[in-house]
């Protein structure tokens, strides 16, 4: 992906103020906050399921990178060459310092909170949807999960 490919952002209801490179992505400051643009090649059904889970977590106070829909209501947007991209609501922060006890303890607490939220009875609907999604996964996706 290069700067020319950022024209895919025209398919979103966003006004880009600035862009910079991230790890395998572009980060864009917009009127709706920070977003990340990354290349995507996978199942749209799985992506839809993933976004439902992330939204579920966000509603319960877990900070997540939510996928944004383009103006047509799709999660994946293609560039002029047919490459798929996703745009995620992003947030700035620093990485966990693995040499810092305080950072590690904080990460463990947050991970425990994440696990507790995902154990709620409401998550059963997501588990059933996941089982259905697993049946429609491509061979490539099944291979990656093994």
Language-model regions: role of each:
Residues 17-24, 92-96, 103, 141-145:
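Amphipathic, soluble alpha/beta structural segments
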Residues 49-53, 63, 83-84, 103, ...:
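Generic hydrophobic, aliphatic-rich segments that mediate packing or membrane embedding
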Residues 37, 54, 88, 111-118, ...:
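Conserved short hydrophobic patches within well-ordered secondary structure
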Residues 94-128:
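Conserved kinase catalytic-core helix
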Residues 65-76, 125-130:
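Short, glycine/charge-rich beta-strand/loop segments that flank catalytic centers
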Residues 128-146:
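Active-site catalytic-loop/activation-segment of kinase and kinase-like phosphoryl-transfer enzymes
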Residues 74-106:
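Conserved structural core of kinase catalytic domains
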Residues 1-72:
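Conserved NTP-binding catalytic cores of kinases and kinase-like/nucleotidyltransferase enzymes
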């Amino acid at each position: 992906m290069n700067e020319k490919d950022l024209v895919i952002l025209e398919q979103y209801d966003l006004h880009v103020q600035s862009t910079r490179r991230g790890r395998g992505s572009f980060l864009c400051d917009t009127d709706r906050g920070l977003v990340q643009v990354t290349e995507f090649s996978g199942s749209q059904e799985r992506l839809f399921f993933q976004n439902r889970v992330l939204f579920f977590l966000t509603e319960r106070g877990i900070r997540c990178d939510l996928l944004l829909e383009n103006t047509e209501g799709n999660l994946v947007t293609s560039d002029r060459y047919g490459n798929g991209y996703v745009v995620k609501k992003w947030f700035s922060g620093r990485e966990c310092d693995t040499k810092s006890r305080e950072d590690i303890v904080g990460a463990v607490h947050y991970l425990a909170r994440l696990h507790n939220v995902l154990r709620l009875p409401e998550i059963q609907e997501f588990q059933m949807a996941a089982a259905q999604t697993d049946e429609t996964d491509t061979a490539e996706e099944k291979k990656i999960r093994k």
